[in-house]
Amino acid sequence: MTVSPTSAPTQAIDTVERAATTPDEPQPFGELGLKDDEYQRIREILGRRPTDTELAMYSVMWSEHCSYKSSKVHLRYFGETTTDEMRAGMLAGIGENAGVVDIGDGWAVTFKVESHNHPSYVEPYQGAATGVGGIVRDIMAMGARPVAVMDQLRFGAADAPDTRRVLDGVVRGIGGYGNSLGLPNIGGETVFDACYAGNPLVNAMCVGVLRQEDLHMAFASGTGNKIILFGARTGLDGIGGVSVLASDTFDAENSRKKLPSVQVGDPFMEKVLIECCLELYAGGLVVGIQDLGGAGLACATSELASAGDGGMEVRLEAVPLRTAGMTPAEVLCSESQERMCAVVTPENVDAFLAVCRKWDVLATVIGEVTDGDRLRITWHGQTVVDVPPRTVAHEGPVYQRPLARPDTQDALNADSSARLPRPATGAELRATLLALLGSPHLCSRAFITEQYDRYVRGNTVLAEHADGGVLRVDETTGRGIAVSTDASGRYTMLDPYAGAQLALAEAYRNVAVTGATPVAVTNCLNFGSPEDPAVMWQFAQAVRGLADGCVALGIPVTGGNVSFYNQTGSAAILPTPVVGVLGVLDDVSRRLPTALGAEPGETLMLLGETRDEFDGSVWAQVTADHLGGLPPKVDLAREKLLAEVLRAASRDGLVSAAHDLSEGGLAQAVVEAALAGETGCRIVLPEDADPFVTLFSESAGRVLVAVPRTEESRFRSMCEARGLPAVRIGVVDQASDEVEVQGLFTVPLAELRQTSESVLPRLFG
C-alpha cells in the first residue's frame, strides 16, 4: 500500500503554538527513555515544553545509541592521542558517517563497523540484514562505491536451544542482503560463548572505494538549497528501532515483544539506490548527503542542519508514506530502510530528480536550507518542530558515569590456567589437537561462509580462509587493500586495556600477513550497561588501550561505534571491543596466501617468541571451561617489526605463504594452512621446548611462514638483521596426505578435515 504524501491529518496535532500555551500538560518522557533532568533541560533549551514531535525527536537523538552520552568523555581520548603524523593520510575521521583514508594514486577507501546487536536477537533475519544495509548506506554517503562487507558475530553456546534460531536468521540475513547487493563477504569471525545467549553481537563492516575528488560530507549549506528525500517510502517499521533497542537491556520475557521495532530491509531497493547515488555524485548534483539510519529523518535533518552554515525548514507532509495515518512524530522517527537525504542547489533539482526517475527511485523535495539557525518542521502548514539543531544532534547530555575496578578482578586474575592438567604424551597431544579442532570454537566456518558470495564483482583476491580479505582497487596498477576485523572478549575480561590491544594487534597482524601495510583503524565497542561502574571501568580501560596501541603502531582511529546495554537481565556479555584494520598493497599479485604448497618443499618457519601463555585460551575453555589469569603479553613494537618483515618478504618474493597464530596456537595454524593448501607437512619441534607449549600456546606477535627452499638463507638473514626471532619448525611435503609432528603423532588430512568441517552442520544443519 502506498499513501499520498498530501494525505490530510486525521487527528489534532500538538503544535509549537499549542505547546507554548499548555506548559503543564503531562508528557510521557520516561516511556520514551528520557530521564527527568533530561526532560527539564529540553524545556530550558526551548523555553517551553516540547511538542509531542519534538519530544520524540529529542528522545531518539539523546538515546545512548545516537548521542554517545555515556561514552563521549572517554572517546575523546582517541582524538587527543592522534598525532598530526597519524592524521596525514586521513581525509575524513571521527564524526563523519565513516572514516576515509588516502591509499595513493588518487584513490581513497572508506570503512566502518557498526552494531545491530539488539535487533538481531529480536528478529534475527531482518536485524542482521538491515545491519548490513545501514552500514552500506554510511559508506554510500561518503561518495564511495561499496565494494565488500565483513562481519563479526557472537552467539550463545553452540548447543544452546536458542542459538540455532538466532544463528540461522542472522546468517541468512547477512547473506540474503549482501548477496543481493552484489557485495562480496570477504571475512570476519563467528564466536560461541554462553555469555552471548539472549544478546548476540552482530557487527557489520563495509568497505567502499572512491576517487579522492568524489568525497562527500554530511552538511546543509547554501540558503535556498533544497532538501530531497529519496529512496523507499516511509512506514511504521523501525519506529523507535535501533535508537531505542540499542539503549536498553533485554530480559527473557519481553524481548520478543519488541518485534515491531525491528526495521525491514529491501536489498534490491538499496542496490538501485547505490547506482543512483553514484550517478548523482558523478554529475556533481549533490552539495551534502546523509543516509537515514537510526532515528530516521530526526537524525538526518538535525545532523545536516547542525553541520551546515544555516538553518532548515522541512515540510513533513511531503514525505512519501506507505502506511496511512502516521503521526508527525512517527514520520520523523521512522527507521524505514533504504532512504537518503540530499542537499541540492535549486538549479540542479530537475537533473537530480531525472537521475532518480532513471533508476526508478522515488525522490521528493521536502524542504530547504534557510539563513537562520533553527530547524523548523511543519505538518500541513502547522509547525510541530522549532529547535536549535545542534541541541538535538550534538549537544545532548554527557555523563561522567561512575567507574570502578570490579571487586572480583583480583580473584579472576589470580585464577591462572597453570593449575589445569596438561597433555604430555604424543597420544594426549594428538587428542588435544582434535578436541580443539572439533570444538565449535575452532572448527571450520565453511557452513556459514559458504552462504555468502565471496567473489562477486571479480575483485576479491583473498577471502575466507585467509587471515585478511584482499581486494583489487585499480585493475591497471594492481593497487589493492587488505581488511581484517578481530576481537577477544575473553582476553578483555581478564584485562580490558591489554585485551583491546590484543584485538588491535591481531587485526593489524592479519592485514600484515597478506603483505599489506596497515594504515588505519575502525572499531565497534560492545559492552554491558554503562550504569554499572564495573562495565564503565572495562570500557574506559579498553578505549585507552586501543588508543595507546594505535599511537604505538602509528595508525589512526578513523571512526567507530559504541554498543552498550549488551546484557540479559543483570548478566553482561564479555567486554568485546571489535577492531578493524585497513591495509594497502601496491600490487595485489604479491599478496601472501594462507595455503601451503605453492612451492615444492617449502620450509616452515615460526616468527616471533613463544611463551607459556594459556590464560584465556581456547585450550582452557574447551578442556576445562576455564577463564582466569592474565592474557598474553602485548608487544606492539614487535608487531610493527613483524609487519615490516612480512611486507619486505612479500615484495622480494622471500615468502610464499603466511598465517597468523592466534586461538589454538601453532597446531591450529599448521592445520588450517595445510588444509587450505591440501598438502601434508612435517613439524619438527625444538629439542629444548615443551611440546605442549610450542604447539598450543596463544602468545601474540607470531606468524607461520612458508619459505621457498631457495630463499631460506636470505629470509633468515633478513630476520636476524632486524632482530625478529625466526625458528625453522618443519617442511611442506606435497607427496604426503598427513600432518606429522615428528616423534609425537601423525594425523591424516582427511581426519582433520572431517573433524573440522562436520561440527557446524551437525549442530545447525
UniProtKB/Swiss-Prot annotation:
GO biological process: 'de novo' IMP biosynthetic process
Binding residues annotated for Mg(2+) 2, in chain numbering: 138, 291
Region spans: Disordered: 1-32
Catalytic activity: N(2)-formyl-N(1)-(5-phospho-beta-D-ribosyl)glycinamide + L-glutamine + ATP + H2O = 2-formamido-N(1)-(5-O-phospho-beta-D-ribosyl)acetamidine + L-glutamate + ADP + phosphate + H(+)
This protein's GO CC annotations: cytoplasm
Listed Polar residues bias regions: 1-13
Places the protein is found: Cytoplasm
CDD domains linked to this entry: PurL_repeat1, PurL_repeat2
Catalytic site: 65, 116 (proton acceptor)
Pathway assignment: Purine metabolism; IMP biosynthesis via de novo pathway; 5-amino-1-(5-phospho-D-ribosyl)imidazole from N(2)-formyl-N(1)-(5-phospho-D-ribosyl)glycinamide: step 1/2
Superkingdom classification of source: Bacteria
Residue numbers binding ATP: 68, 112, 523, 560
Keyword check for Repeat: no
Matching Pfam families: AIRS, AIRS_C, FGAR-AT_linker
Any one GO MF annotation of this record: ATP binding
PANTHER family noted in UniProt: PHOSPHORIBOSYLFORMYLGLYCINAMIDINE SYNTHASE SUBUNIT PURL (PTHR43555:SF1)
Quaternary structure (record): Monomer. Part of the FGAM synthase complex composed of 1 PurL, 1 PurQ and 2 PurS subunits.
Protein name: Phosphoribosylformylglycinamidine synthase subunit PurL
Origin species: Mycolicibacterium paratuberculosis (strain ATCC BAA-968 / K-10) (Mycobacterium paratuberculosis)
